């Protein structure tokens, strides 16, 4: 049967502050149609109805013949340019719901392209001498020792997609890591892609994605500003939001499709919000499942609502590493804003984290790239992708959090323990 549930805001907001409600982003429709688990093109539905001697709405049938429709190959999702001037999203979803009720075996999911809004907090600009010594989170994780131990085992460069506002590779901190990726479908991606306007102009005045990228890979030992987690990376910017922070779920689905097409190793997503489990997993889960099935490591922020993260997407999706935020203090504790619960896999520092250019940042947006960077270190050592999440979540520092519990046995990221395990157990690594 075809479901068309009303959904709360799907605000894929850069997670700096709690999100707020919004409306639909534009008039497009996101849908998935299958028959016996096989992909069905929405353009074929009128013919299927006709062949089965059922009436087909002529207005919708005519619209589908000429409509602009994007098909996301890896997930089977389609994005249809519906509009109130032609056929609306509600009309198309109603049409498909009726078709599914008439045609045995036809399954359809249909949703408007809900809006998202970025929200930011004031950053602490009280320091005018930005240097690596300000990165207390990195000091607490013993990153100097992590880099020393892991360096002799570095065997490969890791492709990391930053799904966010766009990146600016003129920034000397990330310029050396601009990636060039060949698409399996043909052609290539140089540095990134803008899914807001479907162009190769992916830079943004919005600095949210830039901060996340610096935490992953700001260049070490270049006498500039700060340092990132891993130096053996190629970055690609999958821009899903406008400069003002707005974006739609279709952008996220298209970006994940691209991540699969170019074969990245890690997707870092400092975005998300709550939605119904049925819509989260049935519709948008397909785009993410296509990536995790290929062995791509997907890391996502657990959210800033001081709430259970059970229906916070995409972090609640199966196979996605959900990351909560820790305060930089002893004893370890979750940040006051951080989401929590049995769907949270790991926590890392996310309150007052230095992200370059005299900026201290707080929110679950920032432990996410720290975990992504730790995953990149393991992959660069030749650790097999299927073991990375397990190594990270097994080698944590567990801490008491009775009021804000995590998944059983979850704890704080400890990259040093993780790297030592990868070194001590060569079977976890390939080619050694």
Located regions from the model:
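Primarily auto-inhibitory N-terminal propeptides
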Residues: 12-15, 20-128
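Active-site-proximal beta-strand/loop segments in catalytic clefts of secreted hydrolases
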Residues: 34-35, 112-115, 162-166, 216-219, ...
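Protease zymogen maturation seam
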Residues: 73-76, 94-159, 167, 171-173, ...
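Subtilisin-like serine protease catalytic core
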Residues: 145-193, 197-249, 265, 310, ...
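Extracellular S/T/G-rich loop segment that most often corresponds to the catalytic His/Ser-adjacent loop
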Residues: 164, 296, 312-383, 412
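Gly/Ser-rich catalytic serine loop of serine hydrolases
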Residues: 201-210, 303, 359-371
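Catalytic-core regions of hydrolytic enzymes
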Residues: 244-264, 274
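C-terminal subdomain of the subtilisin-like protease fold in secreted/lumenal serine endopeptidases
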Residues: 260-271, 277-278, 282, 287, ...
């Amino acid at each position: 049967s075809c479901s068309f549930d009303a959904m709360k805001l799907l605000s894929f907001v850069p997670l700096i502050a709690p999100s707020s409600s919004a409306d639909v982003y534009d008039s497009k429709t996101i849908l998935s149609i299958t028959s016996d688990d096989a992909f069905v093109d929405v353009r074929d539905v009128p013919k299927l109805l006709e062949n089965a001697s059922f009436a087909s709405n002529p207005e919708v049938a005519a619209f589908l013949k000429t409509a602009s429709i994007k098909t996301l190959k890896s997930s089977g999702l389609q994005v249809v340019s519906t509009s109130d001037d032609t056929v609306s999203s509600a009309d198309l979803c109603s049409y498909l719901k009726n078709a599914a009720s008439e045609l045995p075996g036809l399954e359809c999911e249909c949703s408007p392209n809900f809006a998202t809004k970025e929200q930011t907090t004031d950053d602490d600009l009280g320091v005018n001498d930005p240097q690596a010594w300000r990165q207390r989170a990195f000091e607490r994780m013993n990153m100097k020792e992590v880099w020393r131990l892991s360096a002799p085992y570095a065997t490969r460069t890791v492709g990391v997609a930053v799904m966010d506002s766009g990146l600016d590779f003129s920034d000397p901190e990330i310029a050396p890591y601009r990636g060039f990726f060949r698409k399996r479908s043909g052609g290539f991606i140089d540095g990134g892609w803008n899914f807001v306007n479907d162009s190769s102009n992916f830079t943004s005045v919005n600095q949210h994605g830039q901060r996340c990228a610096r935490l992953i890979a700001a260049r070490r030992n270049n006498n500039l500003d700060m340092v990132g987690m891993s130096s053996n990376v190629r970055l690609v910017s999958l821009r899903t939001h406008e400069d003002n922070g707005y974006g739609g779920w279709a952008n996220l689905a298209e970006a994940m499709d691209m991540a699969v097409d170019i074969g990245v190793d890690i997707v870092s997503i400092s975005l998300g919000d709550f939605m119904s489990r049925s819509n989260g997993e049935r519709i948008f889960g397909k785009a993410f499942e296509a990536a995790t099935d290929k062995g791509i490591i997907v890391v996502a922020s657990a959210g800033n609502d001081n709430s259970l993260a059970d229906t916070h997407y995409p972090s609640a999706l199966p196979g996605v590493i959900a990351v909560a935020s820790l305060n930089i203090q002893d004893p370890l504790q979750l940040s006051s804003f951080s989401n929590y619960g049995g769907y949270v896999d790991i926590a890392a520092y996310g309150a007052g984290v230095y992200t370059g250019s005299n900026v201290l940042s707080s929110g679950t947006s920032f432990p996410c790239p720290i975990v992504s960077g730790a995953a990149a270190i393991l992959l660069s050592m030749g650790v097999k992708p299927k073991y990375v999440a397990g190594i990270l979540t097994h080698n944590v520092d567990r801490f008491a959090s009775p009021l804000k519990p995590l998944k059983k046995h979850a704890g704080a990221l400890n990259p040093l323990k993780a790297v030592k395990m990868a070194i001590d157990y060569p079977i976890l690594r390939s080619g050694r």
